[in-house]
Amino acid sequence: MNYDIFAVGNVSDDTLSLLTVTSMETAVDAGNAQVQIVHAASMAPTVDIYVTAPDTDITTEQPLVTAEFTDATDLIQVPAGDYQIRITPAGETTVVYDSGTVNLADGADLLIAATNNVGTGDSPVTLLAADGDGSFKIWDAEAGAAIRVVHGLSLIHI
């Protein structure tokens, strides 16, 4: 049995709590990737999560999952390959998060959590992916970059 623990909620409004997500230890079938999805974004509503081939029109697709805050899926196996992860408010097709193309490698075993976006861009969430050895963020493809320029030399004028 695997146990993953998230701190969710917000310190400022006293909603901070622990969320324990469990899963059975399951081998990934050859040619597949395995994911477990967690809605850990306290400031996001109930959402539909689409995991499709890149550039697929989601208006003709069913979401992989509909999730409200603190929901977690079971382990889901999908064929290894390139995907696009898009999140919409539940029942709508207006995309509020778009991963762009993401490769789910053969044998990958990922826990992917939607977390509150504290970076750039308008998306309410970013995705945090963990594979047991480390973690990385999957930013919204439309987020852009934040740049801060500091002039710290007093003898040089710009």
Task: Walk through the language-model features, giving the residues of each.
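Intrinsically disordered, low-complexity polar regions and short flexible loop motifs
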Residues: 1-156
